[in-house]
């Protein structure tokens, strides 16, 4: 079944097998954590790797955003990328499209593609693109740093990545006007969280960029890794009109679908208002959507408690 491994399998077969220990590894592989923190002299290097295996039409652009977001959400300043592109055939037009997207998005975000690997692989039915991103950080910020009393902030809105994917890979399923469809496609230009992460990193107790499972899935990962309850007001979670329309067309919940473009952050209650004002000054939409409480690891929303990872609603469209 499409999607992330369950926690038990991940823990048993992946997270327990990490090779030789190294004292310079400050933060290694763990559930819900998307980047490693490595001591390099007096500096902290943040490194992350992430594949794009389902979305097809904007795979190169999406890959750059997803990989760099993981570094930014961990407090790093994304700088270099390593790119692996696997193709089902040697179609030069397909490769041209992917590498042009990688090049354009990297240049737009100020990132350098420093190396990588490209080959044709028998048995694939679509291209795969996996990027590794690295950058230095003044302060590492984990997914699981939330503390009781913190406030939960969300930038931009839910389902931004899903909006773009639906408007390209699944446009034939959307009953949208040409204007609304064009607006939905522009979601791909709003996927980077580097600007807001730079604002929040100095004070955030935890940060996470929601991807699979959407904003709700990201919140669950923050709650489980921090061993806290996160109480969320669904009505406070911003959903753009084009996102709502696209999700309604395929009957998926905007809070449970591909969420790149949003950044979740927990901050001390005394810092929340100031951070929202600073983000607004930078032209970044952000709202407070909840609070962190003592209790079993869970997300409380809509009179329900979510204690397990969320399966992304988009997966059913590919399965």
Which residues make up each language-model segment?
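General beta-strand structural signal in soluble alpha/beta enzymes
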Residues: 27-29, 47-48, 113-116, 154-156, ...
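Glycine-rich anion-binding loops of enzyme active sites
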Residues: 77-166
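Helix N-cap motif at beta-to-alpha junctions
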Residues: 266-272
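Small-aliphatic-rich amphipathic alpha-helix that forms the alpha element of a beta-alpha
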Residues: 56-81, 98-111, 195-199, 215-221
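Acidic, Ser/Thr/Pro-rich beta/coil linker or hinge segments at domain junctions
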Residues: 279-319
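Short, acidic (Asp/Glu-rich) active-site segment that either coordinates a divalent metal cofactor
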Residues: 142-197
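Active-site-proximal betaalpha loop/short-helix elements
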Residues: 90, 184-259
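Extreme N-terminal cap/leader segments of soluble proteins
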Residues: 1-55, 105-106, 110, 313-319
